[in-house]
């Protein structure tokens, strides 16, 4: 590991946030006038931050503050705002000094006033929102809209210029930053980590992003841990451990930690400027060495530990209680200003302490000499195109997916691992797009049968290597497959990669995709809002392959059996969510090609990796996937008739069992007219008024009939189908089978039997719902029950399914 050079230090064991600056890096790079100007910009940021939380009117305090000038409902988070603004304005200096591209991610996104303020002051906000002008009238609107109905949210939402990270749900800032830095060699991603955020599991793991950045081809992430000491009502852990332990912690993680601590503003400006000069210089040294001499060892990237008081520059005390430097600064330090004249005066004094009359002219325009501290054009962090990644996005150069399909003579006769041809297809997608496409997986790419991608690019690895790694390890410092056993970190990397204009693909085990439930939620919400913003350019969809599915987790057992992620996806906006359940290889390839070309969606593809029957030729698969739902004529015998029964399914295993049930019924009752319907696009079941992919009632009724019994065999939890189809005319005759939380170490057929998605249960269900078979079907039901019992007993004795069931083929 490359070590950092020895440096002088003025650090002590003091872990308090007050006093003159204490810093690892010594120096005074700023002149007195520069310190004064930097502090004036800082005062302006803090003034705006307080104004956003409190003010409805009187934005420049041209008259004494009155209750009617104050918002009726006070919302926002003051405590983190000064630290964020301090980082932002010092990064502006770095951008100008080094002509360096930087984007800014605020982990504690609830401190949005500290980000919105400098974005407004640099001019980016008014450029995107001309109605929020750079004068008193615009400032009044800017204050009013914050955390206000009809305005903007209280975090770094998609409406925030320069934001790719909302920071509402904490823990993802470093993984988002890493994704943004991938394949952006000239970019520094400044990622402010809140010390409360640092206690979350995703953040604690994501410190390891420094092992996944290649300085020869990637940009850099500069983590800035803001130790302001408190969460909502508790001290933070990292702010209360001994200084040496904290430094050792980050050194052990492979960083070069640079401390900047204190509250005295002039000395803090000097310390932060010197520290950022060191960090940028060090980053450039690491990158130059790797790009000129090759990457030989794991770099030790710099990071900053910024210890400042929570609510820095705010009221020291309120009503006899400490505020600045305590948890009371977290949200709204003065909450009763409408009714308490003393606190109203405190608020006015607080606002006037920033001396706004020195910062804005008589029209309310920010002083030009102070605005000049910020960069211009696209160097402004609010206008950097990397933070509006769709502006930089290029379509993938796609191979012809048809060339990766399989051929066969008859449907339902041969078995193929569904995901293996997909791996070959993805291999060539990666070959065609060596700088803007990556694959992510939590140690499962080979397990999920996608290992053909290693023919195009290995797994990225720059930590220590052993000789045995060469034997199938597939490791390389040039690799573009990212594997780490943290779904959180991988999902964050992918999101950051997509939001900065690139493309990606993530595969994971179905049961453990739940690890990123809430991350999916947040990303879907982000996309939903972006769709409403004309200035946000389209980004590539998040493509998620769910494999190692519930019905083939018979060997791992109950803990690995959970298809409920689909329920989570269905909770999100129909504008951004898509769910596909391709039943075989050719349909999976068609779906994958479609998803990789799409924009602004979360595409969830459910496909198992094991051997499965193949049903559709490539031409048939393309047509079927284009429609999303359809009758398989070769599996039906109702041609020219009203069907007696509709058998439907969604998912590979449910499809096999549904077809086997049809075969049982047709063998017992040759006159029975059965229509088989396969669903690839799950949202086809919803009405078109609820989802853009939904079928019209006319088309749904044409397929599923108005009054015939429907047996629907579903991959997931059965109630999801009822939820999607409850408005349909024939819902009363819809009977759904799916996973019912009945699992253990089973055989595949036994697991299906336990949850009643097996062929025997489906055939019995059909008989029970056909009045004409109530008498004639009794013997068949007994036969099917006997076969079911025999199948289970065989599994108990031999540990596998009977070959006639495990290698069943379509008999017609």
Curated annotation (Swiss-Prot):
Family matches, as InterPro entries: Phosphoketolase (IPR023962), THDP-binding (IPR029061), Transketo_C/PFOR_II (IPR009014), Xul5P/Fru6P_PKetolase (IPR005593), Xul5P/Fru6P_PKetolase_C (IPR018969), Xul5P/Fru6P_PKetolase_CS (IPR019790), Xul5P/Fru6P_PKetolase_N (IPR018970), Xul5P/Fru6P_PKetolase_ThDP_BS (IPR019789)
Keywords: Lyase, Thiamine pyrophosphate
Any one GO BP annotation for this protein: carbohydrate metabolic process
EC number in record: 4.1.2.-
Class of this enzyme: lyase
Cofactor section: thiamine diphosphate
GO molecular function: aldehyde-lyase activity
Similarity field: Belongs to the XFP family.
PANTHER family: PHOSPHOKETOLASE-RELATED
Protein name per Swiss-Prot or TrEMBL: Probable phosphoketolase
Species assigned in the record: Thermosynechococcus vestitus (strain NIES-2133 / IAM M-273 / BP-1)
